[in-house]
């Protein structure tokens, strides 16, 4: 695993998710994004593709990460991008925990924190996802 910084991109929560909330997307319209880069097996990539929805909301793009090289990333398909999308608070918290665990700088974390969020209206899902957040926190992230 490695981390890097890619110029000219920005992080948004404007990919329409199946649950109606905004999910992460990178878009070539910003000052830059911090990235975590993993080397995974082909079998694990197939599993990740299914989880992330490759071909059903996300496609792939190559990001050129300085000192690392070209890396595959998911990017929202244009028909799934809705600038009015707002992410759920638990989802944004998971993104922040991951960004913090990877040592991304405070100004980047604050930029993520500044993005709008809303409470998940599905009580059962909300409680389940916040339990996930607490498990991640308990794991030291």
Place the predicted regions along the sequence by residue.
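Glycine-aromatic micro-motifs
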Residues: 1-141
């Amino acid at each position: 695993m490695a981390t890097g910084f890619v110029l000219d991109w920005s992080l948004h929560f404007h990919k329409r998710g199946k649950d109606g909330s905004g999910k992460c997307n990178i878009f070539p319209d910003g000052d830059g994004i911090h990235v975590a880069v993993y080397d995974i097996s082909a079998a694990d990539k197939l599993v990740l593709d299914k989880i992330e929805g490759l071909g059903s909301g996300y496609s792939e793009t190559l990001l050129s990460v300085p000192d690392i090289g070209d890396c595959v990333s998911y990017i929202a398909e244009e028909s799934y991008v809705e600038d009015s999308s707002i992410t759920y608070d638990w989802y944004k918290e998971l993104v922040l925990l991951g960004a913090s665990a990877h040592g991304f700088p405070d100004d980047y974390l604050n930029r993520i924190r500044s993005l709008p969020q809303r409470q998940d209206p599905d009580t059962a899902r909300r409680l389940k996802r916040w339990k996930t957040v607490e498990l991640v926190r308990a794991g030291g992230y």
